[in-house]
């Protein structure tokens, strides 16, 4: 994308917003079924919702937005649906990457790339390379991602270091393992949102979600918009985050 304009670098100061929001974008198929439409149309409308939420995240002062784009378990879906999802990813990167770059969005990809089609890998690499110096909003795309697989891969890296004599196993702790995950430089999510009313993480950021606030909203992903995001943030703001401890009492 050599014709992309120079990106913006700073976002608004909104101290009330969570720094990192992660979203499980669920309900595209059910949204389509409720309207008598093919599942592919639900996924297409889901991409439109993603555009809205990326824009809203910047406007609300969110610094990191992680989206669960394609789970490692999604390979069990019909081949035609997988083809539709990959086609949407191709079009999204080709059509939206220049505008994301212009708006100062940095794209990061987490997940397993081995086994993906070569053109998909090339597009993912292009998105990261073009936007690597942007700082207004970091969009983390979890693609072909599974949290258990991510943790297992981190354990394998540590095991190799021990086997090669580069690490004493006694030095391995939670911080060490966390540093071997896919994106250790990105802070853990403050808020995880799941659409469609389902109340589970589905193998998404299970390590990073240790102290995240979880908000489950009943609407399907294609209907999610800035107002819905603001509602989830308002619920987040009402929570008392304890991080395993007690909330300090104010003096009366």
Curated annotation (Swiss-Prot):
The lineage of its organism: Bacteria, Pseudomonadati, Pseudomonadota, Alphaproteobacteria, Hyphomicrobiales. The gene is uppS2. Gene3D superfamilies: Decaprenyl diphosphate synthase-like. Mg(2+) binds at residues 26, 213. Its cofactor is Mg(2+). Pfam families: Prenyltransf. This is Isoprenyl transferase 2. Binds 2 magnesium ions per subunit. Catalyzes the condensation of isopentenyl diphosphate (IPP) with allylic pyrophosphates generating different type of terpenoids. GO terms for molecular function: ditrans,polycis-undecaprenyl-diphosphate synthase [(2E,6E)-farnesyl-diphosphate specific] activity; magnesium ion binding. One of its GO terms (biological process) is polyprenol biosynthetic process. InterPro entries: UPP_synth-like, UPP_synth-like_CS, UPP_synth-like_sf. Belongs to the UPP synthase family. Keywords: Magnesium, Metal-binding, Transferase. Its EC number is 2.5.1.-. Substrate binds at residues 27-31, 39, 43, 71-73, 75, 77, 194, 200-202. It is an enzyme of class 2 (transferase). The active site is at residues 26, 74. GO terms for cellular component: cytosol. Homodimer.
């Amino acid at each position: 994308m050599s014709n992309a304009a120079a990106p913006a670098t700073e976002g608004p100061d909104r101290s009330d917003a969570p720094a990192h929001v992660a979203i499980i974008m669920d309900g595209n198929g059910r949204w389509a079924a409720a309207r008598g439409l093919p599942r592919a149309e639900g996924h297409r409308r889901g991409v439109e919702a993603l555009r809205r939420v990326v824009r809203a995240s910047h406007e609300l002062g969110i610094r990191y937005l992680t989206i669960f784009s394609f789970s490692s378990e999604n390979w069990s879906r019909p081949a035609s649906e997988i083809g539709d999802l990959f086609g949407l990813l191709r079009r999204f990167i080709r059509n939206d990457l220049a505008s994301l770059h212009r708006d100062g969005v940095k794209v990061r990809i987490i997940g397993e790339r081995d086994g993906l089609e070569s053109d998909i890998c090339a597009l993912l690499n292009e998105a990261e390379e073009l936007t690597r110096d942007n700082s207004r909003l970091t969009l983390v795309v979890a693609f072909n991602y599974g949290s258990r697989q991510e943790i297992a891969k981190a354990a394998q890296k540590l095991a190799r270091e021990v086997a090669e004599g580069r690490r004493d196993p006694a030095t391995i702790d939670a911080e060490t393992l966390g540093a071997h995950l896919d994106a250790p430089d990105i802070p853990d999510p403050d808020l995880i949102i799941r659409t469609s009313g389902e109340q589970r993480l589905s193998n998404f950021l299970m390590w990073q979600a240790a102290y995240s606030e979880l908000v489950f909203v009943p609407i399907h992903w294609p209907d999610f918009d800035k107002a819905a995001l603001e509602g989830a943030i308002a619920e987040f703001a009402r929570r008392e985050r304890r991080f395993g401890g007690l909330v300090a009492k104010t003096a009366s």
